[in-house]
Amino acid sequence: MDRIYLDNAATTAVSQPVMEAMLPYYMQVYGNPSSIHSTGRDAKKAVERARRQVASALGCSAQEIYFTAGGSESDNWVLKGAAFAHQEKGKHIITTQIEHHAILHTCQWLEAQGWQVTYLPVDADGFVTAQQVENALRTDTVLVSVMAANNEIGTLEPVAEIGALCHERGVLFHTDAVQAVGAIPLDVEALHADMLSLSAHKFHGPKGIGALYIRKGVKIDPLIHGGAQERGHRAGTENLPGIVGLGKAIELAEEGLAENAARMTFLRNRLISGLTAAIPNMRINGTMDKRLPNNVNVSFAGIEGEAVLLRLDLEGIAASSGSACTAGSLDPSHVLTAIGLTRDEAKGSLRLTLGTDTTQADIDEVVKKLPGIVASLREMTSWCGRG
């Protein structure tokens, strides 16, 4: 049977044009970009072309783009690099309670090294406000980090407003845009971002490659030491095929952004409407207003989300119960508990994230099969609980 893949927030398939762009850089143009011979120079040209493609998508200079191994490295680099580079000013950082663990765990590591971190709460839809940030700012605050879009519930944070506030107050502002790039329009100038993280595998590029935008003039210490790659900011021989794939993927994502967003918004709303009509006691997590166009997150009273996942998988449907980075954890989602769900409600959650290949037939098949799965599991739970 044809499988239906609705876990695109975890990762996406490499598109055919991206794969075709990458292939020559495995066996034909395979030189080290730091080498001065022609094969190395050809590799260097490919790296710089990809850098321009990323810069074009973000509205910045190519010299402000640095390639990394992905979103987690970019987030680690921002927090540790900015913290150590600006510790003479202070050791206070502001973030939110619903950030990706690449942010939260790095902040916890910094706390163990003597930094202080304020974790802002969010409302029932997952929003933080610029006013909250302003209230938390101190004279020793060196960095504010707020994600552009939440990876679990799809909430689009008011990052432009927060960025403007940070600039006005002379505090560095970073946004983790891993889920947002390729899904919504982004411009670093409009966002007032000093730094921005992204990862190729979230928009049909390869895994293991990402980038960090660092505004010209912003001081940040390196995370990885060694050679002089990435203008001395990030050591290590460049992942040439990956960089080429990232460049092509972000170029294609930007070209089809408006069309894909409109189509996925329609399909997302169709999915939510269908499930709402067919499944009683189902909660939609997050807002319907300012939400990623491909994100659906729901909770079912009385059953475990993991059980729903297993049954869906048997039916040929791939989904998730939250962030792929926390799969296997016995703890409920920190995002869902932060927006007010109980542990049981959070454990009964299901995340369905659409992709560019998702069809209306896929959505209708999920609406057809999921209500029966939920009803069956609820019946089993009720039977097992009888005294």
Q: How should these model regions be labeled?
A:
Residues M1-G387:
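Pyridoxal 5′-phosphate
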